[in-house]
């Protein structure tokens, strides 16, 4: 077996930690060795105790206090410190061979979209530690009630995909709230066809709303950005309900396919048979 890692990223509040817990529970029910890697130096509560925790190396609270930095600057410092202390990472990862690592990332999307820090870490995990990596990017389903926010979320997902350069799955999270009618009332009324316009971004859906809420001088820019999304067809979403085991199982199967899980497993030796097994009845 190889080494596999799932990078769980997305904005704060998108349900990353909940998804990590659901993914771990489902994978363990399948008999897999799964471990949580907390990559958020500010995280405090976990449903599953992390097997690897960046806070054992450095914490955001300490950095902000000692270096007089704000939250974002402190977070970048923490990641730079991690990359400068790969011996710690080597010791932590060395105890997990042939295992599935779930990496719970911070919610500051600049790490995936604007800075090379996360892409450097992903490259190290892939090239130096030989992990097969699939990145997931969670966008909260409440964004479908505000097409401008949804439009920005699609662009952020695309930026993360381009920067990380690994197999990538975008997830529209908290779909249980859509089913309950708490959010996404317009999509709910339009049934499945309307929802599909959000899962596979429809340029007309984006243009109509965005242009109606922005200064006319930005309309050509909006058109260019929407055309970019449509031309490359890079961004699509899978629905995720972390409370539904079938939904989590479907996502895991797509992750498995992306990292080619189990494809390098050596075939098992056939069971030895006694001569009596071939005796005619």
UniProtKB/Swiss-Prot annotation:
Subunit structure, interactors included: Heterodimers with GPN1 or GPN2. Binds to RNA polymerase II (RNAPII).
Role, per record: Small GTPase required for proper nuclear import of RNA polymerase II and III (RNAPII and RNAPIII). May act at an RNAP assembly step prior to nuclear import.
One MF annotation (Gene Ontology) recorded for this entry: GTP binding
Signal peptide residue numbers: none
UniProt xrefs under CDD domains: GPN3
InterPro entries registered for this protein in UniProt: Gpn, Gpn3, P-loop_NTPase
Superkingdom, taxonomy of origin: Eukaryota
Region (Disordered) residue spans: 259-281
Claim: Methyltransferase is one of the keywords in the record: no
Entry's family note: Belongs to the GPN-loop GTPase family.
Positions occupied by motif Gly-Pro-Asn (GPN)-loop: 70-72
Protein name: GPN-loop GTPase 3
Organism: Mycosarcoma maydis (Corn smut fungus)
Gene Ontology annotations of biological process type: mitotic sister chromatid cohesion; protein import into nucleus
Keywords in alphabetical order: GTP-binding, Hydrolase, Nucleotide-binding
Residues binding GTP: 13-18, 173-176
Site annotation Stabilizes the phosphate intermediate: residues: 72
